[in-house]
A protein has these predicted regions:
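Conserved redox-active cysteine motifs that mediate thiol-disulfide chemistry
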Residues: 28-42
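Conserved Rossmann-like nucleotide-binding pocket used by diverse enzymes
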Residues: 4, 29, 55-57
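Short pre-active-site segment immediately N-terminal to redox-active cysteine/selenocysteine motifs
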Residues: 21-22, 29-32, 75
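Structural microenvironment flanking redox-active thiols in thiol-disulfide oxidoreductases
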Residues: 61-68
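N-terminal targeting signals for export/organelle localization
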Residues: 1-5, 102
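Non-catalytic, surface beta->alpha helical segment in thiol-disulfide oxidoreductase systems
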Residues: 75, 81-108
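A short beta-strand-turn-helix
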Residues: 5-24, 65
Length: 108
């Protein structure tokens, strides 16, 4: 069994993402968003495939408006890759596994 996908909140985002020692992929999503639900299995895949190189988590945007607004997330799903407390890459909109793999490989 691979690494689990974490759930981040406004309260935990700084300590678990911005201060993390590894690169972190965050999926900004909402339960009412159909394309977001399609991305969920790919977050599990990324957590398992890139275990040791990448931490993966998600942030539900409606319940965590501070983090959503700080990073100016306008549409969902939005994937943001963080390293050393900074955004290094962003992908807006749902993508297929080959595109997710290319996105991650380009930045890891």
């Amino acid at each position: 069994m691979g690494q689990a996908v974490s759930d981040y909140t406004d309260a935990t985002f700084a300590s678990e993402v911005l201060q993390a020692s590894t690169t972190v992929l965050v999926d900004f999503w909402a339960p009412w968003c159909g394309p977001c639900r399609l991305m969920a299995p790919m977050m599990d895949w990324a957590a398992e495939t890139y275990a040791g190189k990448l931490s993966v988590g998600k942030l539900e945007v409606d319940g965590n408006p501070q983090t959503r607004d700080f990073f100016q997330v306008q549409g969902i799903p939005t994937l943001i890759l963080f390293r050393d407390g900074k955004e290094v890459a962003r992908q807006e909109g749902a993508i297929a596994k080959p595109q997710l793999q290319a996105f991650l490989d380009a930045h890891l």
